[in-house]
Amino acid sequence: MRQSAGVDACTEGKAKGNLTTTRSEERSHSMRARRQLERVGLSASSIERFLHAAVKVDLHVKTVLSLSLATLGVLHSVSLCIHVIGRGMAWARDGSPKHATKQVDRLLSNNNVSPWLLFDAWVRFVVGPREELLVALDWTEFDVDDHATLALYLITRHGRATPLIWRTVKKSSLAGKRNDYEDEVIERLHEILPKATRVTLLADRGFGDQERYAHLGNLGWDYIIRFRECIIVTDADDTARPAGEWLTSTGRAKMLKNVRVTQDKTAIAAVVLVHDKRMKEPWCLATSRADLTASQVTKLYGRRFCIEETFRDVKNVHFGMGLSATHIGDTARRDRLLLIAAFAHVLLTLLGEAGERAGLDRLLKTNTVKHRTLSLYNQGCYWYTAIPNMREERLVQLMTAYGEVLREHAVTREILGTI
């Protein structure tokens, strides 16, 4: 019995020793990870400097710090669940998850943080020196919370759309007000952009009506908007048919110029009709871009789906940040959370650009193709999680490239072509 008690005591002592060693190793690993991230430029202080550059408004210093910490929490957790952001923030700061979660919650309830007012600086930051923009307008819904968010995003070349302006409203309030909300968001972007900027708006069938065409024309915007096959299209020879009947037998893209649509015969510059073999349904596109060919208009409209993929990155539980699983009762809180998500999205995109610049993207490809197979956002997500355990020579490559990316942004603003 005495021998057994001695063995148990010895075993218990070894277990405690192993537990202490494990905790010590975890703490050492966490400290190393934080140092690695800080070396690359993804610490709270560097993100705070980024926000000061991106959102040049009169916010309290502590508020900007809270925004930067919340952004850091999203970067680490890749989640928009409030308590998960808090845990990510706590890890990054070696703090208390409880207090960090409360800080995130207070930030989301801070009425002094108004995304609608911050859009002036944010849009100018994202757009940069561009003289021509391709933007997509779409609704995304959160049925459990009776919320619907209208988003106007910039279509880019890196595989994802960059958030510009958004507004969340009660879904139950949309009846009779939907067009008013859309007008407000479109006009908000219009008043921010320089007058010389050429904007082409892409939108699906939910936005295809003659009043929208006239509204965009009055603003001086171009558009490519899909509409239903049953809508009457009258050509220049005064022949009127439902749009679907104007399709060619081969389904190849066809453009009709100087046409009129609907029974009211509203004049628009052109209509493009196409039913490619890869399409489930035909596309009937109303457009003001009569300067383009039918195939060019079709390709431009095809880029609209970038906004759907960005929605998935934000909403999906398995492949994104899981916003659809986060219950938020107040529409203003959701808009603030989307603001934090936008900050994180841009930082991860820039990190992905740095990875490509350093030639590290080839390590992510499972084939030998030359073109990009992962969006810059997804590449950035991977590199952020890989940084803590990254080999020194690879870390130096990424750190150098990321520094170059940020310097170009600060000095020449050419990097804004990336985001």
Regions found by a protein language model. Give the residues of each.
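Short active-site-adjacent helix-start/loop capping segments
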Residues: D94-G95, D143-D146, E211
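Amphipathic alpha-helical interaction segments
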Residues: S96, N111, P115, D143, ...
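Short, charged amphipathic recognition helices of the HTH superfamily
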Residues: S77-R87
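Active-site-proximal, Lys/Arg-enriched surface segment
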Residues: T71, A100-G159, P163-I165, K170
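Short, well-ordered amphipathic alpha-helices
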Residues: I85-G86, L152-Y153, V185-E187
